[in-house]
Amino acid sequence: MTRIVVDAMGSDNYPAPDVEGAVMAAREYGVEIILTGDASKIQPILDSSNAAGLPVSVFHAPELLTMNDKGDDLVMKARHKDAQNSMAVGYDILKRGEADAFVTAGNTGAAMVTALFRLGRIRGVDRPALAPPFPTASGYCIILDIGANPDCKPENLLQFGIMGSVYAERVRGIKSPRVGLISNG
């Protein structure tokens, strides 16, 4: 069974939509969910969501990493080895191999910085890239990077192209994917 860590404190109206969506995923897709965040806020919503018997658990993470966290404060919350915010705890669970994926609706910059400090990076890759699939007339295309790195160097663009190509081949099954460049102006 696929195990997914969900940052229950990530969305604007946390934790209700995060918990309700996680319960729905467990019910409809048969995945195991590990919710990270303040258990005293998560558990009442979980109890009212008819989640009994579903593979949903809570891992208490009492600290918050918010949309307002920036600069040194954000880096400290992401980097500190004893950080107890829902993102740091979630990425640590993933790194230990206790889950297959981590999902957050939280601050994109915080998610990227926390992932870098908690998970590290692939050797030879200077910057991570966000890579959502975009629908097209003939299926989907993958766009790297969608804005987390507005000041890229040529070598970053090359690395994004390589990562996107490998992803398209190995995950999406696209033989000989095309790589192009779109400028944000």
Stretch-by-stretch model annotation:
Residues 25, 48, 124-125, 163:
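A generic membrane alpha-helix/interface feature
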Residues 89, 139-183:
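Ligand-binding beta-strand-loop-alpha-helix segment within the catalytic cores
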Residues 89-93, 126-134, 166-170:
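Short, charged beta->alpha transition segments
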Residues 33-34, 130, 160-161:
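Short, charged/polar low-complexity linear motifs in solvent-exposed/disordered segments
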Residues 1-105, 110-117, 169-182:
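Contiguous, glycine/small-aliphatic-enriched amphipathic segments in soluble metabolic enzymes
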